[in-house]
Curated annotation (Swiss-Prot):
GO terms for cellular component: mitochondrial inner membrane; mitochondrion; respiratory chain complex IV. This is Cytochrome c oxidase subunit 12, mitochondrial. A motif (Cx9C motif) lies at residues 30-40. Pathway: Energy metabolism; oxidative phosphorylation. Its main location: mitochondrion. It is found in: Mitochondrion inner membrane. The gene is cox-13. PROSITE patterns: CHCH. The Cx9C/Cx10C motifs are involved in the recognition by the mitochondrial MIA40-ERV1 disulfide relay system and the subsequent transfer of disulfide bonds by dithiol/disulfide exchange reactions to the newly imported protein. Keywords: Disulfide bond, Membrane, Mitochondrion, Mitochondrion inner membrane. Belongs to the cytochrome c oxidase subunit 6B family.
Length: 84
């Protein structure tokens, strides 16, 4: 097969193993990555590349309804974690 015939597929992110979350239920893992992402961008800025790892992780682990609700809570000022 030549390089011209090769078809590439889009990259699908899969979260790796995190020793802090050894169980099958990944709810806490989802939550922690969401919080870590927002703490990271507040501390380092949106353009800081390592923050993207947290973004990819929470987007792959969390149902979209969860992080949309958390975004609404952050905007309303009643998010349960202090991110600063």
């Amino acid at each position: 097969m030549s390089d011209d015939e090769r078809v590439t597929k889009p990259f699908k992110f899969v979260t790796g193993v995190d020793a802090r979350f050894p169980n099958v239920n990944q709810t806490k893992h989802c939550w922690q990555n969401y919080v870590d992402y927002h703490k990271c961008i507040l501390a380092k800025g949106e353009d800081f590349a390592p923050c993207r790892q947290f973004w990819l992780a929470y987007r792959s682990l969390c149902p979209s309804g969860w992080y949309q609700r958390w975004d609404e809570q952050r905007e309303a000022g009643n998010f349960p974690v202090k991110l600063e």
